[in-house]
Each structure stands twice: as structure tokens, then as C-alpha cells.
């Protein structure tokens, strides 16, 4: 298959799950995975692509279990936000070690640790080829980091949200439980809703749909997959109008 000489996207929002950073470990951050992801982001920057990043916090903290045990949901979500800041600090450090200029912004004030989120500042940094990592979700409880990814993607006018997962794309059923499940190359927003496919939570998904923000789901564990996506090669599942 012929490949494009130039990237098909100019500005992207990369959504990484916290679990992706833990690798085969059950908890925490796998340094080798972190460094590999930083190198893949570096490749995009070298291609001239402007990169925003949102990282989840599930590798460090999961509020759902504690909520069932009686913890207040708001408190649990605030703890989850802090977990995303910790992951953001790790990613910023990995990018700096890879000689990539990166800035970490938080939706909740953490002076002395990272910058407060500023839309105008984020746009300026992206235009100057700085990677911008958006942490602390939306800054509000009850919203997932997928919602934060779509919100920031819309705000920075990203061409696409690239949702990195552990599977190759969106399947008709869970491929682990159903070997006959087929992977979709393209879907419309309506297809996803009608078939009740699990791409991201409904609040996040409808936000993307209402603002016509395409979503591409792909497997970040496949070496080179991120580069293939931005070069327009056949990789993952694209969801659009």
C-alpha cells in the first residue's frame, strides 16, 4: 500500500489510558513503556505534527472500588485527578529526556508542580511545536478522562482524537470473549450508538459527535502504530460523521 509523503493530520489530541503506562505490571508506571511512548510522540513532533496529550490515572488510582466501599464520589474523583497529574509529570519527564519540549497543564491549580490550564497558552505552545500534556481531567468530578480528551480536543481544534487502547480497534464484540468478533475500519457516530459499541463513555462520545470531532481507536502496544495512523495508513478504527 502506498503511503502518504506527509502526515494527514496537523494537530492531534492523543488519549492514553493510565493502564497503558503500567505495561505488564498490575500497578504503577513501567519505565520502558513510558520511554517508548515518549519516543513515538517525538516522531510525531519531528514530522511537524502538533501534539496534545491526555493521560488517564487508572494505573495509580481507581475510585470506583472505594466509592462502593463508601468513599464520597467527589473525593474519589479528586484523587483520580491527582493520579493523572502524576502520570503527566512522568510523561513530561520522559519527553524532556528524549529532548522534546513539553509543558504540563493541570485543570486544578497545583502551583510549583505544573502550569494552570490556559486555552490561549496551550494554543500558543502547540503552534510553537511544544507538546502539551493536559492533566486533572476536566477539573470536575463525574467526568472521565475520555471526556477531558474530547473537551481539550475541541478546544484546541484538533483534527482528531487518537484513543490508544490495548486492542487493534473497535470490534463487533469483545474479541477476547468472542473469537468471531470482527474489527471495523470505519464507523459513523450513529453506527456506534445504534450498535451500542463500547468506544468511550456516552458523555465523551456525544461531545465529540456534536462537535464533529473524529475519533480513531488504535493499539498503542503495536510498535509504529501511532506513526502509521498519522500518515494515513490502514490502522485502527476511524469514527466520524
Curated annotation (Swiss-Prot):
Regulation affecting activity: Allosterically activated by GTP. Inhibited by UTP.
Bilayer-spanning residue ranges: none
Gene Ontology CC, one term: cytosol
Region annotation Involved in allosteric activation by GTP: where it falls in the sequence: 23-28
Entry annotated with the keyword Lyase: no
Molecular function, one GO term: UMP kinase activity
Domain of life: Bacteria
GO biological processes: 'de novo' CTP biosynthetic process; UDP biosynthetic process
EC class of the enzyme, as a word: transferase
Binding site for UMP: 57, 77, 138-145
Keywords of this entry: Allosteric enzyme, ATP-binding, Cytoplasm, Kinase, Nucleotide-binding, Pyrimidine biosynthesis, Transferase
Pfam families named in the record: AA_kinase (PF00696)
Reaction it catalyzes: UMP + ATP = UDP + ADP
Predominant location category: cytoplasm
Pathway recorded for this protein: Pyrimidine metabolism; CTP biosynthesis via de novo pathway; UDP from UMP (UMPK route): step 1/1
Family: Belongs to the UMP kinase family.
Quaternary structure and interacting proteins, as annotated: Homohexamer.
Name the UniProt record assigns to this protein: Uridylate kinase
